[in-house]
């Protein structure tokens, strides 16, 4: 598993413009990520998802996020997430470690 401290820096640099992680965080361009792990795609309450996200039907976990974050548009064709992805596996692992910690405490 990755380093949550490094993952926080990656989140701030690459994700925080569109996402929040706090329990009471608001949706931005992207959904609030609180409760992400164990939730199906397209299910954050109050966020308007594309049909592609709603119908993907996978459950977010370490493995699914590892694949998704490498190339979101390849993993969920039709997603409105405008993000090229993170090619370095160790950076994705760090980000996932941070998300796992910050979206459930």
Curated annotation (Swiss-Prot):
Heme c binds at residues 15, 18-19, 81. GO terms for biological process: mitochondrial electron transport, cytochrome c to oxygen; mitochondrial electron transport, ubiquinol to cytochrome c. Its main location: mitochondrion. One of its GO terms (cellular component) is mitochondrial intermembrane space. Keywords: Acetylation, Electron transport, Heme, Iron, Metal-binding, Mitochondrion, Respiratory chain, Transport. The modification N-acetylglycine is found at residue 2. It is found in: Mitochondrion intermembrane space. Coiled coil: none annotated. GO terms for molecular function: electron transfer activity; heme binding; metal ion binding. The keyword Ion transport does not apply. Binds 1 heme c group covalently per subunit. Pfam families: Cytochrom_C (PF00034). The keyword Acetylation applies. PROSITE patterns: CYTC. InterPro entries: Cyt_c-like_dom, Cyt_c-like_dom_sf, Cyt_c_1A/1B. Gene3D superfamilies: Cytochrome c-like domain. Belongs to the cytochrome c family. Electron carrier protein. The oxidized form of the cytochrome c heme group can accept an electron from the heme group of the cytochrome c1 subunit of cytochrome reductase. Cytochrome c then transfers this electron to the cytochrome oxidase complex, the final protein carrier in the mitochondrial electron-transport chain. This is Cytochrome c, somatic B. It comes from Xenopus laevis.
